[in-house]
């Protein structure tokens, strides 16, 4: 449990690190109570909420021995979240109370006149629904430290009067993407490495929807004062498109040969987001500086 400016925050999670999907419906296999165990698979369930302002639900499953014969990673996850904005009445009332308190010398401590809890606005929200499917495998070339990963993901954004994305505030948007990643890790310890390096590179791409949907994005949703602006926004961002590139490198060098010593870590990270069509840039999946 926790306490934030929007009220009480609660979080409940369950993680099983020795789960067995194969034993789930087999009563003759190993169980702990009603839970099938013994395969080293991971099952996670989570819920987080602070009442009407925010709810989040997620479930995921992963295994490092998909098929049971080779070290092949497989993962699957689903999630849903909803965030609700604060009514503009809150800011009006907060300013008025601050002004009156300044003029009269009274404090509003102990009163709920300016608490977020009193200004929940159901007409301002963001809902996110998604699922992902992942696969990974060790490589033998160029050496045994390399791994290859692939992930297919889908996310649906549902917005109403949401003012935080700038380009898009009301409507539904879909994101279907594929991520290819390669990683090389040669550190001597996962938690406190003294030697080795960790390199990773990935690219995430969506289909170039604008290449074949025959829409004039140059003149679509350009005038906020137009009566059709909201509907044009929904048409423009129904399917978002982009390509995202990431690179990360870290090296670790022990400064002495002693068992306990200082370790020098060098690090570099790079990220790039591009668009297929300069008139259809994604309001989501961007970098924030």
Regions found by a protein language model. Give the residues of each.
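C-terminal outer-membrane beta-barrel translocator/porin domains of Gram-negative envelope proteins
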Residues: 1-7, 13-15, 165-289
């Amino acid at each position: 449990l926790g306490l934030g400016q929007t009220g009480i925050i609660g979080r409940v999670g369950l993680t099983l690190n020795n789960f067995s999907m194969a034993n789930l419906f087999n009563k003759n296999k190993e169980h702990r109570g009603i839970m099938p165990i013994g395969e080293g698979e991971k099952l996670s369930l989570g819920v987080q909420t602070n009442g009407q302002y925010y709810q989040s639900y997620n479930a995921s499953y992963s295994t490092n021995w998909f098929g049971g014969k080779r070290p092949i990673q497989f993962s699957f996850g689903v999630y849903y979240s909803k965030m609700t904005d604060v009514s503009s009445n809150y800011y009006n009332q907060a300013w008025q109370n601050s002004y009156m308190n300044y003029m009269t010398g009274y404090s509003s401590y102990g009163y709920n006149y300016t608490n977020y809890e009193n200004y929940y606005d159901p007409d301002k929200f963001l809902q996110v629904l998604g699922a992902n499917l992942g696969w990974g495998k060790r490589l033998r070339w160029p050496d045994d430290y390399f791994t290859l990963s692939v992930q297919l993901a889908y996310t649906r954004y549902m917005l109403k009067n949401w003012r935080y994305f700038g380009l898009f505030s009301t409507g539904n948007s879909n994101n279907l993407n594929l991520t290819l990643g390669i990683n090389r890790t040669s550190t001597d310890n996962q938690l406190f490495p003294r030697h080795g390096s960790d390199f990773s590179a990935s690219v995430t791409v969506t289909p170039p929807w604008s290449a074949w949907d025959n829409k004039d994005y140059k003149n679509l949703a350009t005038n906020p004062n137009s009566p059709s602006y909201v509907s044009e926004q929904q048409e423009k961002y129904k399917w978002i498109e982009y390509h995202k590139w990431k690179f990360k490198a870290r090296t670790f060098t022990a400064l002495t040969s002693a068992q306990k010593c200082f370790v020098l870590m060098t690090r570099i990270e790079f990220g790039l987001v591009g668009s297929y069509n300069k008139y259809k840039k994604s309001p989501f999946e961007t970098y924030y500086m």
